[in-house]
């Protein structure tokens, strides 16, 4: 049974109903409708922490989706799952792929920055000051771009940039 038919969460049910109405009203191909259904089910599974199921749905959506912009969001969500699982190298791959298709995705830029910042913190713990500085500089570059695209977001990053002299 498709996930859309077994949602227990009110927000997921509402999203599913609205999405189904839009799919019926908007002129889209069967392939696009199927891709969106998989994407929607992936988002639902992801919101419930069912990451394996979410990935299966996202991979199927990727197989069907041809629009680069829409694919960017699928790739971004796959990156989120890998981040949640602590698979930062894989997450970075998906965030970069998302940005290749949609350079105006500040959340992907922010998540890349967060990973580089985390790696910088790890380098400090290992006594690798030079490496940590390079990683923090990389994080700063990505945060600056994210902030340029979404100036009212990422307040903590803005403060960190100012406090570290990287603004």
From Swiss-Prot:
TPR repeats lie at residues 35-68, 72-105, 120-153. It is found in: Plastid, Chloroplast thylakoid membrane. It is a peripheral membrane protein. One of its GO terms (cellular component) is chloroplast thylakoid membrane. The keyword Membrane applies. Keywords: Chloroplast, Membrane, Photosynthesis, Plastid, Repeat, Thylakoid, TPR repeat. One of its GO terms (biological process) is photosynthesis. SUPFAM superfamilies: TPR-like. It holds the Pfam family TPR_1. HAMAP family: Ycf3. Essential for the assembly of the photosystem I (PSI) complex. May act as a chaperone-like factor to guide the assembly of the PSI subunits. NCBIfam families: PRK02603.1 (NF002725). Belongs to the Ycf3 family. This is Photosystem I assembly protein Ycf3. The lineage of its organism: Eukaryota, Viridiplantae, Chlorophyta, core chlorophytes, Chlorophyceae.
